[in-house]
Amino acid sequence: MLLKFNEEWARSSVNGALAIRKDINRIVDEICAQGYRNICWLGIGGTWASGMQAAVHMKEQSEIETWAENASEYNTTGNKRVGEGTVVITSSVTGSTVEVVEAVKRMQAAGAKVIGFIDIDTTELAKLVDYEIAYPVNEQLKFFMVADRFMQNNGEFSDCDAMYAEF
């Protein structure tokens, strides 16, 4: 038995995240229609770790070029793969993580488009990103929904809709 586990809250939070899948699909579909070159999962700390999970998930199943980028490292060294056609996905509870804000500005200056899951939609980061979705918690699920839609649109995940219908 798990102490202090609230099953009702857990189910509600997952269902809430699944409810934004239509918004995620709309954004990813728009990006796919415009064309893109690669996908970068940007973060620092826990968000970077979530990005690594999404990148590994995609590398296992997709030919789409993807990687996880540590915001602090990017601000120090840059990355020549980031530019026109790069799609950056990030997430932030506060919307004010200095390293992520700086990295997003630099990536956009290089030509990247940014999808941000920013919990507080009035913050600097929420205003910076090209596509903003505000929903707290379930960062990994949100990232996986983005990854899965890109793979589905690339003809690599035909069972995507059926899988999410089961959730």
Which residues are covered by each model-predicted region?
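Cofactor-/ligand-binding subdomain signature composed of acidic, glycine-rich
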Residues: 1-26, 151-165
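Helix-loop module immediately N-terminal to the HCX5R catalytic loop
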Residues: 12-28, 67-80
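Glycine-rich phosphate-binding loops that contact phosphosugars or nucleotide phosphates
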Residues: 32-167
